[in-house]
Amino acid sequence: IIGTALAIAMIMVIVITLRATIAPFAPETHRDRMLIFRFAGLQSKSNVNWQSNGPIGYNTAKACFKAMTIPEAVSITNIWQETMLAAKPAGEMESCSVLQTDDAFWKIFEFEFLSGKPYDNADFDAGAAKAVISEDMARRLFGTSEVVGKTFLLNHSAYIVCGVVRPVSKLAKYAYAQVWIPLSSTSAFTATWGDDNIMGMTAVYILAKSKDDFPAIRQEADRLRAIFMAGHPNFDLLYRGQPDTYFVAAQRYSANNPPAVKEAVRQYILTLLVLLIVPAVNLSGLTLSRMRKRISEIGVRKAFGAPRRELMMQVLSENMLYSLFGGILGLVLSYVAAFLLGGMLFSVDFVSNGGEDLRTMCVDLLFDPTVFLLAFLACFLLNLLSAAIPAWRVTRTNIVDAINER
């Protein structure tokens, strides 16, 4: 039972971790239709040894991606969330995570608005000092979630709350924040670096109408890049295979290194195989040992005419019960592990948001009966095979040898 439980628990933890990387959940509901562009390389045409790597500027992103016609929506945001200080009405300061976005951000990511609405295109073009805040941040700042129309200070700049959304899990790493403000209301809107002001601090998120449009979207992105770079004849802008699908983007850890996609897939497959095969071998040995202790009982039953098939079915039915109890225990253990080891498993810090972030994570990712049933089925089949082989060997033992435990 313990062997089955540990196998199922470990498999579920691995699958939950993988699901957090690729499976859609609010507000990143459309992960399967998303393409992501976060880093580029700027290569000098006159000096092959000169190259800059990193995010691109807003104007570059706008010229190379906003003009696209094939996608459903294109959003430009600050590439990373920033930690800022929000001032309560009484003057106390509260640290919060802030993401600067455009208005199309709210079309790509599906937030649950509890009150108010997001800032729109007119607000973005005007650089309006409006903010969408999470429910938990609203309570921390104002003591209530009914805060639409109220003003607070964000890094000493006044912002008006235009909407309140349900808290977001940090596992939604591209949509997560506690406060969302227009990119055009901050200096990040015009921030650039490098030659010709091509590089900056923005990321691009593209929502395709269908996954089948991905090749056409990449071709259109290359065409727009060529048009933009015609005005910068001294440089090449390197996309390095981007925009990426969500899974590939999760494996891209730096601007100038390719994502290790094959290695990641190979690692997941190898881990799952080890988690399945090792317990199966152990269970086979345990079953054979248990059967040898009952060999005299089997010999007596065979002497009284018990058919081999009946003895086999008894052993297999007992193993089914072990698998069932082990599966239930494994399910419980996997949830306990996800709660206790969440920060390590998902590479996020749950301390700042406490149980609220764990709750939003668990509702969307942990309690999925399909994942459990698949893991349980895999372990059950292996347990069945691991029990069938020793049972077949023992039931073929000669009656006299079985009674004499030989």
Model-identified regions with their sequence ranges:
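Short, strongly hydrophobic transmembrane alpha-helices
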Residues: 1-23, 327
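Transmembrane alpha-helical interface segments in multi-pass membrane proteins
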Residues: 2-3, 7, 296-342, 374, ...
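Structured, solvent-exposed hinge/loop segments at the ends of secondary-structure elements
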Residues: 15-145, 153-159, 343, 347-357
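Hydrophobic alpha-helical interface/terminus motif in multipass membrane transporters
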Residues: 17-21, 286, 291, 298-300, ...
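C-terminal membrane-exit region of the final transmembrane helix in multipass inner-membrane proteins
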Residues: 24, 368-406
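Mid-to-C-terminal secondary-structure elements
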Residues: 102-118, 129-258
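Membrane-helix entry/capping segments
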Residues: 227-271, 293, 341-372
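A hydrophobic alpha-helix feature that marks transmembrane segments and, especially
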Residues: 271-298, 311, 385, 390
